[in-house]
Amino acid sequence: MDALKEVYSTIEKRIKEKPEGSYVVKLTTNDKKTAVNKICEKIGEEAAETILAAKDNDKSEIIYESADLIFHTFVLLAKFGISYEELNEEFKKRMK
């Protein structure tokens, strides 16, 4: 399994099983509106940090912040019940 798919599966599992102390659980367990707001705030924060890293031309920081951005985007998608396969299919459509 590739790393991105494995991370996505772990996020889905944590949303479903709600293990104590999980960061994903902390982001996703409030009422849906509050949870979505928290996740969107994190996405905005990570997007800004990715932009700043790019402006600083710092490759390692771009990679680090991009991973955070992708992770939080995955949390949002999983919160809405969107599967990794659905996301993958959207990318396949765009390759045509």
UniProtKB/Swiss-Prot annotation:
Pathway membership: Amino-acid biosynthesis; L-histidine biosynthesis; L-histidine from 5-phospho-alpha-D-ribose 1-diphosphate: step 2/9
Top-tier EC class: hydrolase
GO biological process, one term: L-histidine biosynthetic process
Pfam families, sorted: PRA-PH (PF01503)
Reaction(s) this enzyme catalyzes, per UniProt: 1-(5-phospho-beta-D-ribosyl)-ATP + H2O = 1-(5-phospho-beta-D-ribosyl)-5'-AMP + diphosphate + H(+)
Subcellular location: Cytoplasm
Assigned keywords, A-Z: Amino-acid biosynthesis, ATP-binding, Cytoplasm, Histidine biosynthesis, Hydrolase, Nucleotide-binding
One GO molecular-function entry: ATP binding
SUPFAM superfamilies: all-alpha NTP pyrophosphatases
Superkingdom of origin organism: Archaea
Matches recorded under InterPro entries: HisE, PRib-ATP_PPHydrolase-like
This enzyme's EC code(s): 3.6.1.31
GO cellular component: cytoplasm
Family, similarity comment: Belongs to the PRA-PH family.
UniProt protein name: Phosphoribosyl-ATP pyrophosphatase
